[in-house]
Amino acid sequence: MLRSFFLLLTLVLGFDSPALADDMPPDVLARTTTQEVLLILKQDKEMQNGNQTKVYQLVEAKILPNFDFNRMTQLAVGKHWPRATAKQKQSLVTEFRNLLVRTYSRALTEFSNQTIEFKPMTIKPEDTDVTVHSEIRQPGGQPIPIDYSMYKTAFGWKVYDVTIDNVSLVTNYRASFSSTIRQSGIDGLIKTLATQSARGTDKPAPRPGS
């Protein structure tokens, strides 16, 4: 299951877009605003007790705006993307997004005592695609490295892939998506994503050892 994978993802991708975020380096944006989300999680007893409405609102407001779901879905679908119709592409993006919303929301309710350390990095003015490095530290456990693949857009930096402990989110989903498409076609993948989202499962991309 991807539950622990997405818990880590949620903790470090929960950075909202404050004023002037468009001009803020990606590592600074992540480091400074992650603290806001961690504070909310620690103080909001309703979310800690599983209030899904509030959790969904937090995910929608502070986590998902930092993703480029179109690019992420295109990369996850891979070689099958060009032969999908415009309607199928939109459905794939929508259903993939819905699945991640539910997965992130469940992960938020499992937040406990993890802390985050962002690694120093140097970004040149001309850089448009970077990797932000960080570590999740857990009491009694080894640090877990997390890398964020981000690119610069007209609306600030966006995440298009995350690698946790050498496991790429996009690559994981690509393998699962490709298998489903071979068996059931693109419409079959859309149906599978919708079904998994509706029942709240994160089965499409099992993490090794989880």
Where are these regions (language model features)?
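Solvent-exposed loop/turn segments at secondary-structure junctions
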Residues: 81, 98-99, 123, 137-138, ...
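Short loop/turn positions at the edges of beta-strands in beta-sheet-rich folds
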Residues: 15, 138-140, 154
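Sec/Tat signal peptide C-region and signal peptidase I cleavage site
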Residues: 15-21
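Low-complexity, intrinsically disordered terminal/linker segments enriched in charged
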Residues: 161-210
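Surface-exposed, charged secondary-structure patches
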Residues: 102-144, 196-210
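Early exported N-terminus immediately downstream of N-terminal targeting peptides
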Residues: 23-104
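Sec-dependent N-terminal signal peptides
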Residues: 4-13
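Short beta-strand edge/turn micro-motifs at domain boundaries
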Residues: 143-171
